[in-house]
Amino acid sequence: PMVWFIDSAGARIDPQGALSGDNISLFAGSGHLFREEVIMSGVVPLVAAMVGPGAAGTAYIPGLADFVPMVRGQGSMALGGPPLVKAVTGQDISEQDLGGTRVHAEVSGVGDVEVADEATCIALIKDYLSFMPQHCEERPPVRTDVRDPVDRRDESLLDILPDSPRQAYDMYAIVKTIVDDGHILDLKPRWAKNIITCLARIGGYPIGIVANNPKGLGGVLDVNSADKAAHFMQICDAFGIPLVFLMDVPGFMVGSKVEHEGIIRH
């Protein structure tokens, strides 16, 4: 696996910087970095931890990664930082308002999880990689210390699911009931809340779960939820992680807003 810890404001563009005069050729090598990341994609797990800013070139790294945790108030990513945005568009905006942790966790969906500090970020990366093989030709690791029996019967499921199909319920409660020890790694939980994508285990075996969430837009599919589910399924497919679908969906969203967003392509 490849893990980046990103804390970079990008290349210097002042007269002494890498992009000045004859020095611009020195920065051209960054294209090779992006090429290698593309080649590695789907072959080994790619993690980009945003522990600081990632502007310009360093913003492409998380854009190509599989898993992007961000440290709250520290991490950010944008193709152009606030000074460049001001120079080009005239807009005054802070680093966090432009591409901070809340923005990418809730609005854009580029970030997967917003965490409190770097220690929590590292622990989360370890948890993510515990589900992953070392590379695509290796089987996902199986935990042998699981004591949660796979054949257990849980009557609480009958209480979670309502009798009426028009009544919302907690899909997370169902997911946690059927997996080992109730532990899940929820990916992009604050973006496209109408669908849940998470990693978990059953009998020690890693699985990916895709579940419609009745508490988010009634579980209906829209552009963002389709993108979220598709990206997650591609990662699971690349690394041999079985998928479990919990389906309760009224269909695709309709209306001018989603048509203008290109829902037919999704």
Predicted regions and their residues:
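Short low-complexity stretches enriched in small and charged residues
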Residues: I24-F27, P69-V71, L161-Y169, C198-I202
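A glycine-rich phosphate-binding loop feature that marks nucleotide/adenosyl-phosphate handling sites
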Residues: S8-A9, P141-R153, A192-K193, L246-M253
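Conserved catalytic cores of soluble enzyme domains
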Residues: I6-E137, I241, V249-H266
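Non-catalytic terminal/interface segments that mediate subunit docking, oligomerization
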Residues: R166-H266
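Terminal amphipathic helices with adjacent charged low-complexity linkers/tails
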Residues: V113-V175
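Short, exposed beta-strand "edge-strand" segments with a Pro/Gly-rich flavor and a Y/T-containing core
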Residues: K86-I93, G109-A116, I160-Y169, P214-L221
